[in-house]
Amino acid sequence: MQLSELRENMQKTIEATQRSFNTLRTGRASASLLDRITVEYYGAETPLKSLASISTPDSSTIMIQPFDRGSLSDVERAISMSDLGLTPNNDGTNIRLNIPPLTKERRQELVKTAGKLAEEGKVALRNIRRDAIDDVRKQEKNSDISEDESRSLQDDIQKVTDEFTTKIDDLLKIKEKDIMTV
């Protein structure tokens, strides 16, 4: 595995961690809160964003306009059953979600969840590092590279891993600050 390939794989992990963070609720309305919501529509689990237009008219409201009015009750049910803790208001054509201010306890829960998501990202980085180091050791064993080259490559792999681990820590700090801001 080349260092450029290693960086590319680790960057994908950073992006996946960022997407996970985006699904965590902060005090503001955001369409990305609904990214994980799937709706049972004609017997198939369908992502909400492919069934409806989602907008945020203000900082505390999410407006959902299904393309098919027949799916209103399905969308409403999916949101009610989700772990978002939001109550949908169905007016016959649209669904409004009012985002109440987060309680201190809920904010602390979300910070813990963000920490778990960050740890999952770090585990993924360590797995990528392990695979890269295994490749280097195989090359050394097959006499494709010298012991010194192997050690140098392993050091480079560790430096890249440390760099990306720091990026995840920075993303976590930003998200924690965002969650705890009242």
Swiss-Prot record:
<dbReference type="InterPro" id="IPR002661">
    <property type="entry name" value="Ribosome_recyc_fac"/>
</dbReference>
<dbReference type="GO" id="GO:0043023">
    <property type="term" value="F:ribosomal large subunit binding"/>
</dbReference>
<dbReference type="GO" id="GO:0005737">
    <property type="term" value="C:cytoplasm"/>
</dbReference>
<dbReference type="Pfam" id="PF01765">
    <property type="entry name" value="RRF"/>
</dbReference>
<comment type="similarity">
    <text>Belongs to the RRF family.</text>
</comment>
<protein>
    <recommendedName>
        <fullName>Ribosome-recycling factor</fullName>
    </recommendedName>
</protein>
<comment type="function">
    <text>Responsible for the release of ribosomes from messenger RNA at the termination of protein biosynthesis. May increase the efficiency of translation by recycling ribosomes from one round of translation to another.</text>
</comment>
<dbReference type="GO" id="GO:0006415">
    <property type="term" value="P:translational termination"/>
</dbReference>
<dbReference type="InterPro" id="IPR036191">
    <property type="entry name" value="RRF_sf"/>
</dbReference>
<keyword id="KW-0648">Protein biosynthesis</keyword>
<dbReference type="InterPro" id="IPR023584">
    <property type="entry name" value="Ribosome_recyc_fac_dom"/>
</dbReference>
<keyword id="KW-0963">Cytoplasm</keyword>
